[in-house]
């Protein structure tokens, strides 16, 4: 969000260091080097070598030394998705007696709440794509149609409209799976009398507009 860096490499150890002097340094793995160069405004990109016995937290400490941050107060985004418990323990151990640490997990999240005009435009574009996906649901939500076909058509119109993958899978269920609240791999064929529950998002440049619909197939019963 701060730099434009577009990757799912956050599932591995990587750190963006920002200091009060305006220095911005990314520590990441080699597979994300060109990703950062092509998608972000980060100029200083450092690589830690991913091999048996690697300790990227120690590589981070070298960067902190370079920035004269020893003995200073550092905020860490502990709630970051890629910072696993193991990596957090390694990070804490590396920085023990080196600097003081504060949990600043909400610092960026709170800033992101206030959207720019450009971001709002992205969300609105995502909403248009979500509506187009819903149009496909209405076309194919019929007896004898596979949930797979519905998902395929929804994703087709989103990608053809310039959209992206969503942050998580579309949630779809009918029959015995109609009340599930999470995606699972089994796909059903819609029955003569059924209920289709579907939750999805139109996504544009990773900005989402999410929707949910419950659609009776055939005649609605008293529960509906």
Give each language-model segment a name:
Residues 1-224:
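Active-site neighborhoods and metal-handling regions in enzymes and metal-associated proteins
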């Amino acid at each position: 969000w701060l730099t434009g860096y577009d990757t799912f490499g956050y599932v591995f150890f990587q750190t963006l260091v920002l200091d009060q002097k305006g220095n911005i340094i990314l520590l990441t793995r080699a597979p994300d080097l060109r990703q950062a160069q092509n998608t972000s405004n980060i100029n200083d990109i450092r690589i830690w070598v991913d091999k048996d016995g690697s300790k990227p937290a120690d590589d981070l400490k070298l960067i902190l030394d370079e920035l004269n941050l020893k003995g200073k107060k550092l905020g860490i985004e502990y709630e970051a998705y890629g910072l696993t418990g193991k990596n957090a323990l390694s990070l804490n151990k590396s920085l023990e007696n080196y600097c003081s640490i504060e949990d600043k997990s909400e610092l960026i999240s709170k800033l992101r709440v206030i959207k720019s005009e450009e971001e709002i435009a992205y969300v609105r574009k995502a909403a248009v794509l979500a509506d187009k996906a819903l149009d496909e649901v209405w076309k194919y939500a019929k007896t004898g149609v596979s949930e797979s076909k519905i998902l395929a058509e929804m994703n087709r119109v989103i990608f053809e409209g310039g959209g992206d993958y969503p942050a998580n899978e579309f949630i779809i269920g009918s029959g015995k799976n109609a009340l599930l609240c999470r995606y699972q791999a089994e796909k059903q064929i819609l029955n003569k009398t059924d209920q289709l529950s579907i939750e999805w998002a139109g996504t544009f440049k990773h900005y989402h507009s999410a929707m949910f619909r419950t659609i009776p197939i055939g005649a609605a019963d008293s529960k509906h």
